[in-house]
């Protein structure tokens, strides 16, 4: 904050000001990774539980029990991978009808009833980059897996320098990187692992990686949908936290 007060202290003051107590070491106890709870993505967030100070004598013991015993009971036995989450969705293939690298390339329409599984258009240049990078991972060559090689590739292909690397292929056999609200602008960092498809992930694929069921629809345009999905708390994580909080209420 501008006055130098750590965010954690402000959070503690905020809870205390309305009569609630939170765990004594938020950084140590409250950080949770959604991938531990069945969500196919690495997504670290703080889950802060507040208990009213006047409802029991030893709030800290209950808070410690919540983080160390109750919530961990709902962890999954194994982590869910990207391929397990989206691998059964129909392929969406690029329709390349031009050799102009700047031309916008469309994609085949998937034959499925699932909503929002539709690719956005990309330039031929980007399609070729996506295919090359996905094939680099799939083949095991791994020439473009570090920041420098990816930044150099961006400069070579786009003709501009970037302080950060702009490309990332989702690994089929691992959880995804964190789904973000500005995915509609940062699709280069969410490239589909299948080289044949040459694209970033669709809204439905992003929703599945957030653990939404396919019957969950999103109202709005594609940009609105990416934002809603990226800002959401993964439903599977929310369910686990809710069940754990329910146990705390039973104790109280």
Predicted regions and their residues:
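C-terminal target-recognition/interaction regions appended to catalytic cores
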Residues: 100-252
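Class I S-adenosyl-L-methionine
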Residues: 1-154
């Amino acid at each position: 904050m501008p006055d130098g007060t750590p965010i954690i202290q402000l959070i503690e003051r905020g809870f205390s000001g309305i009569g609630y107590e939170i765990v004594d070491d938020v950084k140590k106890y409250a950080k949770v990774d959604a991938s531990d709870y069945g969500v196919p993505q690495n997504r670290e967030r703080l889950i802060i539980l507040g208990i009213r100070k006047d409802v029991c004598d030893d709030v800290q013991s209950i808070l410690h029990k919540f983080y160390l015993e109750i919530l961990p009971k709902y962890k999954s036995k194994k982590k869910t991978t990207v391929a397990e989450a989206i691998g059964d969705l129909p392929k969406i293939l690029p329709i390349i009808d031009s050799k102009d690298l700047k031309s916008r390339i469309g994609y085949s329409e998937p034959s499925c009833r699932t909503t929002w599984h539709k690719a956005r258009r990309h330039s031929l240049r980007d399609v070729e980059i996506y295919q090359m990078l996905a094939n680099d991972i799939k083949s095991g060559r791994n020439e473009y897996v570090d920041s420098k090689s990816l930044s150099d590739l961006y400069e070579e292909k786009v003709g501009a320098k970037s302080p950060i690397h702009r490309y990332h292929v989702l690994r089929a056999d691992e959880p995804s990187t964190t789904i973000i609200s500005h995915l509609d602008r940062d699709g280069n960092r969410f490239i589909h692992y299948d080289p044949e498809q040459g694209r970033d992930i669709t809204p439905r694929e992003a929703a599945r990686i957030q653990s939404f069921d396919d019957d969950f629809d999103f109202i709005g345009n594609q940009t609105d949908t990416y934002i809603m999905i990226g800002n959401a708390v993964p439903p599977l994580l929310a369910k686990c936290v809710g069940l754990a909080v329910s146990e705390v209420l039973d104790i109280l």
